[in-house]
Amino acid sequence: VFAFVLLAQLASGSEQTQQAPSAGTAVVELNDTHPELFNELLEELDERHFVKIELDNVFSAQLLERFLERLDGGKNYFLLADIEKAQSQWRNKLDDALKQSNLKPAEQLYNLWRQRALARIEQNIALLETPLPLPEQADTAIEFDADKRSWFSSPAQADAYWQLRLAEQLGGLMLADKTAEEAQELLIKRYRNQLKRVEQFNATDLFSSFANAVTSIYDPHTDYMSPRSEENFKINMSLSLEGIGAVLQIEDEFTQVVRVIPGGPADAQGILQAEDKIVGVGQEGEDV
């Protein structure tokens, strides 16, 4: 399996200053470094990736589909009219925009998604703060599989879907031995946390979403990592084997054993030693 990770060194200096927009404005704007960074991403893919892809109308259509999937793969927020407008505007034009270092289409689509998501989550919280009728058995059929559902044809259809979905979620929690009040409080907390996460999304998140929509066209194992994502990746890697009884850290491109914890599984086995470098992880009998 070929894995190709692109690290955004150019953005590392500016990411610390990225601020999430206020919920009221619901606008995320890319800065002047992002087009340059995106050009570097395309150059890296063209020069180093084994898959060669032309920036043409086929690429444009794929990119639009992948980006919309990343934004709202569950078909929870966009309306059919939003999708149709996006396809009309950008299906055959994203490639032309990228050739001109124009990331405004990504900005436009991301902010529309953000606007729809914030409005929907706020509406869900408002609904949950009033008593919701639990659906009767005959009325509980709801299709959660986005592949089997169409986009909402109207705000009214979206409202009806979400009212039923919230009632289903409440019912599910009550079946798990929550009282109606406890279920209501728990769901409100979940949606408030979700609202906070969306409010905190910033230009780095926008850029990463669009960049990864591009890299996914090349292959599913090609990823763009922002400096923050790279840091989280390193943290996760450094902690991934601590359960075996060893303290680990990232050293250059390898995970290195800092020390073996006395009495732990690694100490009992006697194979792993301090300063060993871990180049792969596998189950017993597997090739690494």
Show where each model-derived region lies.
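Bacterial N-terminal signal peptides
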Residues: 1-9
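Flexible, low-complexity junctional segments that flank or bridge functional domains
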Residues: 12-288
